[in-house]
């Protein structure tokens, strides 16, 4: 199993947020801005740039389906970059594959612009997506998404304890699940639990809910009822409708 502990992010490159854009509107924009504001205050002692919200609104305008990236670098003006997204990549039905990698202490709670560690891991593992483990083997998150497992009708996901990104999609998925009567526990997971799970899925700010079909060395899973229910609920929250019918 690969271990990545030498490529620490360069704080001077700043932090960023990526949001889904649907019908000219950035999805969950307030939650993304709140997370960015918290990172800027903690890391640099700076406030959210006053132009951040207007830059997002301008960038999202006219984009039917896409992603928007807002980057803030200390000492520079914030920048926005947008791109159209293939509809098949938003709430994808095709299952993804994971491959475990060790990152002692995890990636942390900030969305660093310096993604050398993640980019290196992704390049070495493609087509699989890195599943980040702590040094003791605790599963934490994906390189671009948060981890959920389903077992016996309930969900579990790693806690936001400083080792993982407090995902916007993660928070909304938990809300959707609990509103639907699905129990969700936020706690440390084990590799044995992951291997024994009935279903595994990831959540992310652009892809929404993404089923996991396989993890190297751990097992394979089918996309089942709980994944479908959370997916449909998040689709309705973000897009106003779901494709479950």
Go through the PLM ranges and name each one.
Residues 1-58, 62-67, 71-245:
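Helix-start/capping segments and mature chain N-termini
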